[in-house]
């Protein structure tokens, strides 16, 4: 392997005595590039190529979900937020055979929660936005059946946050402080969540909104606009997206791949 060793001068402190010791630490071998732009790994010449990956942003898709017991089809319309770094959030409008239309969301790929619980957790409850959900349901009347059932479930923002926490971390005792911290860290903390400038531009274009490109975390208005488009699609208004279209893909360059490796090294 054509490489060079990496050594780091490290300083260690004894927590009990306060003694400080400095020494050189071997961190590993770093592959070296040849003058032809290739690498030699275990005697084999290799090259790093760019990757075609899903672009960050929001994607609206139709679909069908099957229940394994009776293989009955559930008609779906989904709106999924794909960040550059962080947890996905998937919202859906579902039509079960012979039952009311329901809208829900999966936060951090956990169990499905009611869409009304998510909206209340974002601050669209009676205390912060009086009458908002009633007006929302009047506009999308096919959700009236679900609204009548969910009206009294986690009716405040605090109770909605606790409900999401219990779904995401079953078995752990929920407190309002930990529930708020978890919800914020998932989508509204720049250290854990990054939509990227490209993702923000694509989301602005898809949602027909104007938000600064440097706003790389989610806003509650983003989620609300996604919900509105998703239920519009269920009502027959608007167009779905083609996930395989090249407009929904991007090139991950060699420089970005190396950047991610350096970031991993820094975190160590």
List where the protein language model places each region.
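N-terminal non-catalytic structural scaffold regions of very large proteins
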Residues: 1-265
